[in-house]
């Protein structure tokens, strides 16, 4: 049985979220949450929410699911749209700022 959860338009660079997502791929859900608890990155908040959402989806799909058996089968971070902003610079010029968004997908299996 597989349970899936997706968080879209997360206001964080996909490259930075992938650093943390790569660390927890393949771990059991409990172990992954423990690893995230002691990781000092901003990306742990959306990743934790998506993992908890996927585990809740697993309990809806199967009432007798054992949470100790669930592990992260797939976790990937895709690039979302880019918000373009401008910062004024000297002599009337402007510098473009690209604010990147992420789509986080987690698939749990038992």
From Swiss-Prot:
CC per GO annotation: cytosolic large ribosomal subunit
Output the Gene Ontology terms for molecular function.
rRNA binding; structural constituent of ribosome
Keywords from UniProt, A to Z, are: Ribonucleoprotein, Ribosomal protein, RNA-binding, rRNA-binding
- Ranges annotated as spanning the membrane: none
Q: What does this protein do?
A: This protein binds specifically to 23S rRNA; its binding is stimulated by other ribosomal proteins, e.g. L4, L17, and L20. It is important during the early stages of 50S assembly. It makes multiple contacts with different domains of the 23S rRNA in the assembled 50S subunit and ribosome. The globular domain of the protein is located near the polypeptide exit tunnel on the outside of the subunit, while an extended beta-hairpin is found that lines the wall of the exit tunnel in the center of the 70S ribosome.
Family stated for the protein in its record: Belongs to the universal ribosomal protein uL22 family.
Q: Which HAMAP family match?
A: Ribosomal_uL22_B (MF_01331_B)
User: How does the annotation summarize its subunit structure?
Assistant: Part of the 50S ribosomal subunit.
Q: What's this protein's name?
A: Large ribosomal subunit protein uL22
Q: Per the UniProt entry, what species is this protein from, by scientific name?
A: Leptospira interrogans serogroup Icterohaemorrhagiae serovar Lai (strain 56601)
